[in-house]
Amino acid sequence: MFFSLEQFRKAWPKQGWSWDYRFSMVASSFHVDLIPDAERALLLAFPESYDPKGFARAPEHIRELGESVGGIRADQRMFAGPAVGRLVPIGLWWPWGDEITISLRVGLAGYVGEHDLRRLQMNFNALG
């Protein structure tokens, strides 16, 4: 799983990730002009995508995480990779509402330990 996240990070159109302490995820903001490149990169680690309409049929652990961050609203999407053991990679696509900026947060669902979060931070060079 961390290998696919590494491939994703290398393909991501923006450099630089920060640590989002609210959600214990790495975050990157980008301009809407980069949407095609961002979507291509997401496919490397996150083959499943859920919008507000399809969120109800997402697996339970995906719905639980989505609800823990306030739900999935219009224009937002949630991405998931395949489960590896006790972990599932997750992406949250959140437009800012200014029509030009989107944030992507990448995190882990499942039975996540401190060492898993630390490894995520290190892999994305988002040490906080």
Regions found by a protein language model. Give the residues of each.
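A cross-family detector of function-defining hotspots
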Residues: M1-G128
